[in-house]
Amino acid sequence: MGNLQIDEISSIIRKQIKQYNDAVGVGNLGTVLQVGDGIARIHGLYEVMAGELVEFGDGTVGIALNLGSDNVGVVLMGDGLMIQEGSSVRATGKIAQIPVSDAYLGRVVNALAQPIDGKGQISASEFRLIESPAPGIISRRSVYEPLQTGLIAIDSMIPIGRGQRELIIGDRQTGKTAVATDTILNQKSQNVICVYVAIGQRASSVAQVVNTFQERGAMEYTIVVAETADSPATLQYLAPYTGAALAEYFMYKKQHTSIIYDDLSKQAQAYRQMSLLLRRPPGREAYPGDVFYLHSRLLERAAKLSSQLGEGSLTALPIVETQAGDVSAYIPTNAISITDGQIFLSADLFNAGIRPAINVGLSVSRVGSAAQIKAMKKVAGKLKLELAQFAELEAFAQFASDLDKATQDQLARGQRLRELLKQSQSAPLKVEEQIATIYTGTNGYLDILEIAQVRNFLVRLREYLIKNKPQFGEIICSTGTFTEEAKALLEEAL
């Protein structure tokens, strides 16, 4: 009996010796010193890289941002409620990256590119770094193709080109998101992939935008990246970079893409919150010193690629909110200096019923007419000048009692041109319809109408052209020029 036990024991020992694995696992580990407000301070992690992902014992992931001599400051990508003092932390050796694929089109995802629309997982075999480097000088070419927004005021006077960065700036409730969403709706049949990034917004506002896209068939070519107001600051900070990585995937596949950041003021506030909690020194308006770099490295990723790289493009339309129209605040001035122009939306114009409430005098596109088709250049040349003269005359006319006939005519023309620029939300116009509208206004065909009749007349004119003069649209679409034949067809219709 004793022998049997000894045999059993020796066989167990032999078995254990055979199964013994002498591989040594080396891990970069640390322990939590302190946690709260979405920030954890970690002792250890001596070889961690800046921006490296770290994993806590409960599965929460964070990013190492502050590398101190005695501890590491980590921002959490979750609520971190299960993390306690003394919990273990492991460095993953990875920088934040997301899966990318064509299957993302039509989906709503969060800042980690995980679906949040309840339509199941998204299949992807490729990965992109969230913080990818921007294309270099040799990889780019100058912007020369238009990105049509469908808004007359923008396409005629503040044209946006494919690969440009055009800031949309204005107070809250002035129609900034409406301009951006109309631009996405207008890309239907234009072969442009759109990414809409919602940062720190109400969930109801994001749902409304997604519903609009679904009703109008725009989700087929759109990806929505959403981190709402109740999301951790880390995810609100990351969301724009995730959107840019998804758009870049299509740009490097020789496609045209456009991205809306709605809005970067909220991203800057989330970054300020993280920086102050990490005890980084505050600067102007309590923002950290590198808040300019926060936005410049994001917006520099917009580009028109060279012919060697396939001529894809990424057009960025960042939105920034101002307080009481103050464009000289810190974040607005930063964004204006980084971008290639701005569309300024005015609360006064919005309240006066001029919508979209674009202040043409303060708005500018630094790409200019290079991003317009020849037909638009030809008819829109006079429009900006006439509107500028009208604005000056209107201010002067408030003090003058008797005006000569020429001045009265100019004021009447200006009022009708201003009426011509008004558009309903979610009703973008095709470029040929815009050209017909502008030509009608600048050549005096609206002068005999009452101001209240102008919009109705223009709607009927556009319908008549589509129904009875389809050649007009065909000429402009195929040649891109306002030929004598097109002019004759339009004048017949008028």
Curated annotation (Swiss-Prot):
Record-linked PROSITE patterns: ATPASE_ALPHA_BETA (PS00152)
> Cellular component GO terms, alphabetically?
chloroplast thylakoid membrane; proton-transporting ATP synthase complex
Bilayer topology annotation: Peripheral membrane protein
Q: According to the UniProt record, what class of enzyme is this?
A: translocase
List the residue(s) that the UniProt entry marks as the site Required for activity: 363
Protein EC = 7.1.2.2
Q: Which reaction does it catalyse?
A: ATP + H2O + 4 H(+)(in) = ADP + phosphate + 5 H(+)(out)
Record keywords, A-Z: ATP synthesis, ATP-binding, CF(1), Chloroplast, Hydrogen ion transport, Ion transport, Membrane, Nucleotide-binding, Plastid, Thylakoid, Translocase, Transport
Q: Which domain of life is it from?
A: Eukaryota
Q: SUPFAM superfamilies under this entry?
A: C-terminal domain of alpha and beta subunits of F1 ATP synthase (SSF47917), N-terminal domain of alpha and beta subunits of F1 ATP synthase (SSF50615), P-loop containing nucleoside triphosphate hydrolases (SSF52540)
Kindly list the positions annotated as binding ATP. Answer: 170-177
Q: Which InterPro entries match?
A: ATP_synth_asu-like_sf, ATP_synth_asu_C, ATP_synth_asu_C_sf, ATP_synth_F1_a_nt-bd_dom, ATP_synth_F1_asu, ATPase_a/bsu_AS, ATPase_F1/V1/A1_a/bsu_N, ATPase_F1/V1/A1_a/bsu_N_sf
Please give one Gene Ontology molecular function term for this protein: ATP binding
Under the heading Pfam families, the entry gives: ATP-synt_ab, ATP-synt_ab_C, ATP-synt_ab_N
On assembly, the entry states: F-type ATPases have 2 components, CF(1) - the catalytic core - and CF(0) - the membrane proton channel. CF(1) has five subunits: alpha(3), beta(3), gamma(1), delta(1), epsilon(1). CF(0) has four main subunits: a, b, b' and c.
Entry's HAMAP family? ATP_synth_alpha_bact
Would you tell me the protein name for this molecule?
Answer: ATP synthase subunit alpha, chloroplastic
Q: Which organism is it from?
A: Pinus koraiensis
Q: Which gene does this sequence derive from? A: atpA
